Amino acid sequence: MTLWAINRAAHGRRENYAIKIIQIKEGFCVCESGFTMYEFFKIDDRVLKAAEEAEQKAAPYLAKISETQRYNQEKMQAAFMQAGVSESHFVATTGYGYGDRGRDVLDEVYARALGAEDALCRYNFVSGTHTLTVALFGVLRPGDTMLSVTGMPYDTLRGVIGITGDGNGSLKEFGINYEQLDLLPDGTPDYDGMETAITPKHRMVYIQRSRGYSLRPSLTVEEIERIVKIAKRRAPDCIVMVDNCYGEYVQKMEPTAVGADLMAGSLIKNPCGGIAPTGGYIAGRRDLIESCAYRLTTPGTGREIGCTLGNNRELFMGTFHAPNVTGEALKTAVFTAALFEGFGFDVTPRYDEPRADIIQAVQLREREALCAFIRGIQQGAPVDSFVVPEPSPMPGYDCDVIMASGSFTFGSSIELSADAPLREPFAAWMQGGVNFNSGRLGAILAAQSMLNAGFLNL
């Protein structure tokens, strides 16, 4: 049987083309070229076979994620019901925003869903780093010392602390001291070292849950709980703060549910389901949240001021969908790990290892192989799929960075995205995928891009 496929949309215009289809196999069209038209995509049969094998291999772990999704979605449903969310909470406010009921109820939903005493959820936070900065400046005072027990923080936070940059406006300039306990050589926390490093002089013990641009394991809630217990034994009055970016709803509990005093994250990552246009949250002890609110606005007014400009509906909607969307992103990561491990690349975590965030690192070994992977992820995006990512400088980083992010919200990392500093070990850090089907396709297109560039031996 011979069929001819004509007309396709490309780069916003219609183009005619003809591919001779020689066979219909299992719902897909096999072309003379040896490629399978995956209905709408030109993917090599060998890549498709590898993808099928990867998904079969990962099936038990995908099922476990589904169970966590279900639990966390029920928890979120309960939080909405207990807070009494109603349509009236979607009403916009302007000006000072006094009496914004939706804003206050959204805070309650976050506190309940995250297992915290209180929470502060605002679209006014412009990034995860900004949210963390408000929390740090909100609770630390001149002369205080913070101790990071997970080694060097993420690149963009180093300028906030005063480790890099000219120090202008940093914690260091305000007389707040910084100390650091490195991780063990295998990237795990140095619990024995904490027993001596943490002392009553430390006002804050700081934990970065996610790996950032490193290959160390992200921290599970159980590991964070162990750190909390050591910190509270060694320095009972210290504040244990967690950078929870990329970690929300990955497990059934959050750090605040196991004793962390404060944690923060970005709404364009896990907590708002790919719907929030911007924002962040801080959750934890009620007295600390009040201090953070005073830092965000002004002492005395705190959380009682700040209009929402019609954003409440999107924030409520995204928050409700977040547990399910996070699970879809996790499934995408597990599938990608299984697929690229099958191609012979080192991945972390492996498909069968416990996960504490949505990030999947794939070591591509070579600069151009890395670029091919990133470009393939971009090709699988619903927005700007025709864009070809190129390495370029980026504020806060010490080398060129290449990024794929064809997202509806600029910079959203709960939507399928990938980024990588152009330095050894030439690893791509991929995250997101608001539904598994589209995320799976993105990973397959990344593999096809690498095959086309000559970096897969099949």
Task: Describe these PLM feature segments.
Residues 38-59, 66, 75-82, 86-89, ...:
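Conserved PLP-enzyme active-site core in the AAT-like
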Residues 94-102, 106:
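N-terminal small-domain helix-loop-helix segment of the aminotransferase-like
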Residues 341-458:
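Conserved C-terminal alpha-helix-loop-beta "cap" of PLP-dependent enzymes
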